[in-house]
UniProtKB/Swiss-Prot annotation:
This is Pentatricopeptide repeat-containing protein ELI1, chloroplastic. Residues 1-19 form a transit peptide. Keywords: Chloroplast, Metal-binding, mRNA processing, Plastid, Repeat, RNA-binding, Transit peptide, Zinc. The gene is ELI1. One of its GO terms (cellular component) is chloroplast.
């Protein structure tokens, strides 16, 4: 077989082996095979290879195993080109060598080479076996996997456990649940690997119930299957389930969690603001054999930032060895969401100046958010324009979202509107919602109504747009307009996303909704709410009832505001913690202007620092003021 130009490399030649073998007495072939397997370096393999070539043993029909052993040895020492060059220099390679070469190409990302080798195998009139297909499937996309699946069936290997597992994995990675399920259901024996691949498939599609059912039915579970299930919960909006499963893993004692487990659990903590649980995981990592590598450190930075403890995030960041771009991005985003815009921009510049790392599209999202939160219009526009001009990064919808938010919050509504119209891509509902929110903030109800009614005409299903339009109508007392929007939502089956606020007390996350009376301490919570209401009124509080969407009497509007979810969470925090201790509240939606005013007053009259994370950013309330400067 001719040598491939792509794989040309410096393998030993006969004429070069004299020196290498002058003091090397050749052992018998069986011993050579053992020596190849035990080789500690590529130099040892090259020396043995040279000796074998000198004695022409590679061509000996009794010793084909030497070729295979050399191929695998080069691959195991990272000399992939040596390994594949050896294959291409072999005359009439057999099935075992073809399979070894396909496997080497596949596991090293040389997908095209793997398929070329498979075609050569078929051209040599050699029938592939189960190991050939298992190796080749590692290089398959869903599309090519379907083609290879037909070959698998042609050669009668459809129910082989190794091949079936490979097929399930290919379909799972491509999100083809139906095909994966068909192969999985036909397997006479389901392996740990195939079951884990199927769980991955369910989890990727957000079907965590099916994933958990299969997970629970497994007789044996390794750490990979645990990780897939925990991460599946965390990535699809079930953070509490993720943490409960993590605790179950620890309680069972085996298998031991690894770095991937910890990162998934930290992600779950980030979503619900479970700071104490996140801190416990940090301590657990330090006391276990889990390495505090850059991935775990980045997970900790993200968790501490999103759970309201920026100081601890900074400490972890400073102690992180060999920071990669993901770690820098996490810290920049942390500064941005807490309103420390100048620190975010400083880090953006330090990252490039000190480390030489180039920013990615994710870096620019955090940096532009920092500009938006601080109203740094000129700086934000300069950074946005530099993406393409200096770094060759094409702006995505998220970057336009930051720019539109920046312009809108600064009151440049027409400019924000023009930016959306001039984009080279279709605007999504998040982008339009940003402009609508800015219209409400700056009182431009004409433009707001125009945009909202245009979007409703496009039949956009985002409930936030309808709610913003309702807010615009309510702000000017147009309750007929509010009722019209509400009826329209009913007709289209659009349900308003409920506001949910959480607070963590003694490692337990407590959840509240507006008007919630299901908490065990509900009586004490409402008593505290009444006390708060009396005290803030004595400090000049006047309810902003324009934020109430219902056409109610003024007293009823005030009562409606008093039981918003964030106020219930704050009240529970006040009765459950020591006087003067800080409170951390997490809300899934933007905090309304009235609750923002009330929280400032509560921080003043109680002498407490209150940290609140809403959909947009963090608010640090201290002594009657907020870190956002009432700009959010």
């Amino acid at each position: 077989m001719a040598s491939s130009p792509l794989l040309a490399t410096s393998l030993p030649q006969n004429q070069l082996s004299t020196t290498a073998t002058a003091r090397f007495r050749l052992p018998p072939p069986e011993k050579l095979a053992v020596l190849i397997d035990k080789s500690q370096s590529v130099d040892e393999v090259l020396q043995i290879h040279a000796a074998i070539l000198r004695h022409n043993l590679l061509l000996h029909p009794r010793y084909p195993v030497l070729n295979l052993k050399l191929h695998r040895a080069y691959a195991s020492h990272g000399k992939i080109r040596h390994s594949l060059a050896l294959f291409h220099q072999t005359i009439d390679p057999d099935l075992f060598l073809f399979t070894a070469a396909i496997n080497t190409a596949s596991i090293n990302g040389l997908k095209d080479q793997a398929f070329l080798l498979y075609v050569q195998l078929l051209s040599s009139e050699i029938n592939p076996n189960e190991f050939t297909f298992s190796s080749l499937l590692k290089s398959c996309s869903t599309k090519s996997g379907k083609l290879i699946h037909t070959h698998v069936l042609k050669f009668g290997l459809g129910i082989d456990p190794y091949v079936a597992t490979g097929l399930v994995d290919v379909y799972a990675k491509g999100g083809d649940v139906v095909s994966a399920q068909k192969v999985f259901d036909r397997m006479p024996e389901r392996s740990l690997v195939s079951s884990t691949a199927m769980i991955t498939c369910y989890a990727k599609q957000g079907n965590v119930e099916a994933a958990r059912a299969l997970f629970d039915s497994m007789c044996e579970r390794d750490i990979v299957s645990w990780n897939v299930m925990i991460d599946g919960y965390a990535q699809h909006g079930f953070p509490n389930d993720a943490l409960m499963l993590f605790q179950k893993l620890l309680a069972e004692g085996k298998p031991k969690p690894d770095e991937i487990t910890v990162v998934a659990a930290l992600s779950a903590c980030s979503q619900i603001g479970a700071l104490e649980t996140g801190r416990w995981i940090h301590v657990f990592v330090k006391s276990s054999r889990i390495r505090l590598n850059v991935k775990v450190c980045t997970g900790l930075i993200d968790m501490y930032s999103k759970c309201g403890s920026l100081e601890e995030a900074v400490l972890v960041f400073n102690d992180t060895p060999r920071k990669d771009i993901v770690a820098w991005n996490a810290m920049i985003a942390g500064y941005a969401m807490h309103g420390y815009s100048q620190d975010a921009l400083r880090l953006f510049n330090e990252m490039q100046g000190i480390t030489g790392l180039q920013p990615t599209d994710i870096t620019f999202i955090g940096t532009l958010q920092a500009c938006a939160h601080a109203g740094l219009v000129n700086e934000g526009i300069r950074i946005f324009e530099s993406m393409g001009q200096e770094y060759g990064i094409k702006p995505k919808i998220e970057h336009y979202g930051c720019l539109v938010s920046l312009l809108g919050r600064a009151g440049q509504l027409k400019r924000a509107y023009e930016t959306i119209k001039n984009m080279n891509m279709d605007a999504d509902s998040v982008l339009w919602s940003s402009v609508l929110g800015s219209c409400k903030l700056h009182g431009d109800f004409v433009l707001g109504k125009e945009i909202a009614e245009y979007l409703i005409g496009l039949n956009i299903k985002n409930s936030g747009i309808y709610v913003l339009l309702s807010n615009i109508y309510a702000s000017v007392g147009d309750y007929e307009g509010v009722a019209k929007v509400r009826n329209l939502m009913k007709e289209k089956g659009i349900v308003k996303e409920p506001g949910i606020s959480t607070i963590e007390i003694e490692n337990k996350v407590h959840e509240f909704r507006a008007g919630d009376r299901e908490h065990s301490k509900s009586k004490e919570i409402y008593t505290m709410l009444r006390k708060i209401s009396e005290r803030i009124k004595s400090h000049g509080y006047v309810p902003n009832t324009n934020t109430v969407l219902q056409d109610l009497e003024e007293t009823e509007k005030e009562q409606s505001l008093q039981v918003h979810s964030e106020r219930l969470a704050i009240a529970y925090g006040l009765i459950s913690t020591k006087p003067g201790s800080p409170l951390k509240i997490f809300k899934n939606l933007r905090v309304c202007s009235d609750c923002h005013t009330v929280t400032k007053l509560i921080s003043k009259i109680t002498g407490r620092k209150i940290v609140m994370r809403d959909r947009n950013r963090f608010h640090h309330f201290t002594d009657g003021s907020c870190s956002c400067g009432d700009f959010w």
